[in-house]
Amino acid sequence: MRRPGAVVRRAGGYVTNLMPTAAGDPIGGGLGDQVYNRLLGERIIFLGQAVDDDIANKITAQLLLLASDPDKDIYLYINSPGGSITAGMAIYDTMQYIKNDVVTIAMGMAASMGQFLLSAGTPGKRFALPNAEILIHQPSAGLAGSASDIKIHAERLLHTKKRMAELTAFHTGQTVEQVTRDSDRDRWFDPVEAKEYGLIDDIMPTAAGMPGGGGTGAA
């Protein structure tokens, strides 16, 4: 079953795209452990799956760990179809909480909560690779239960929609009304359109153009 808000676009339709080995502690260990530990040593965090509580706990822990050196940037690479709002908000709040600049880089796709985290990077340090795709849309959830429960959940969803629109407006420079209109249905952006809208600050074909080389040492 698809997680609320998580989408992946491919030829022929929408499919699930999960990568449970992202952000450390890969299943089975071995080479995957070495790769993600090496990335973390370079201050790189990778979100390469739908956002859920497990990945949010890992990423927030990594952000807090890297925040021990507050003068160095942290690099968050994003290839995500979106996912849980509450899990994503845990990552978002931690990004705002720490003193470090958080450089965000979209690769592949940053959709829904993936887009939200991308746009929440430090102003001037939000990037996309040339062929990334970015999606904004309103929060969604399946509602079930008694009429009273459905009413409570619907009211909460409207509150969440309003809050997400306010924060997206803050990070993009758009008005809340504009964001609300644009996210009423799926709206896809290529990197040029995303830059014009304020979702990102620049398009980077190579790591050499990013602050600190994007954590790759290419600068």
From Swiss-Prot:
Superkingdom assignment: Bacteria
Subcellular localization: Cytoplasm
Q: Which SUPFAM superfamilies match?
A: ClpP/crotonase
Supply the alphabetized keyword list. Answer: Cytoplasm, Hydrolase, Protease, Serine protease
EC no. given is 3.4.21.92
Q: Which GO terms describe its molecular function?
A: ATP-dependent peptidase activity; ATPase binding; serine-type endopeptidase activity
Q: Quote the catalytic activity from the record.
A: Hydrolysis of proteins to small peptides in the presence of ATP and magnesium. alpha-casein is the usual test substrate. In the absence of ATP, only oligopeptides shorter than five residues are hydrolyzed (such as succinyl-Leu-Tyr-|-NHMec, and Leu-Tyr-Leu-|-Tyr-Trp, in which cleavage of the -Tyr-|-Leu- and -Tyr-|-Trp bonds also occurs)
* Active site (UniProt): 112, 137
Q: Which CDD domains match?
A: S14_ClpP_2 (cd07017)
- Provide GO CC annotations from the record: cytoplasm; endopeptidase Clp complex
Q: Which PROSITE patterns match?
A: CLP_PROTEASE_HIS
Q: GO annotations under biological process? A: protein quality control for misfolded or incompletely synthesized proteins
> Tell me, what's a Pfam family for it?
CLP_protease
InterPro entries this protein is in? ClpP, ClpP/crotonase-like_dom_sf, ClpP/TepA, ClpP_His_AS
Query: Subunit details for this protein?
Result: Fourteen ClpP subunits assemble into 2 heptameric rings which stack back to back to give a disk-like structure with a central cavity, resembling the structure of eukaryotic proteasomes.
Similarity remark: Belongs to the peptidase S14 family.
General function of this protein? Cleaves peptides in various proteins in a process that requires ATP hydrolysis. Has a chymotrypsin-like activity. Plays a major role in the degradation of misfolded proteins.
Query: Matching PANTHER family, A to Z?
Result: ATP-DEPENDENT CLP PROTEASE PROTEOLYTIC SUBUNIT
This chain belongs to which protein, by name? ATP-dependent Clp protease proteolytic subunit 3
Source organism per UniProt: Streptomyces avermitilis (strain ATCC 31267 / DSM 46492 / JCM 5070 / NBRC 14893 / NCIMB 12804 / NRRL 8165 / MA-4680)
Designated gene of the protein: clpP3
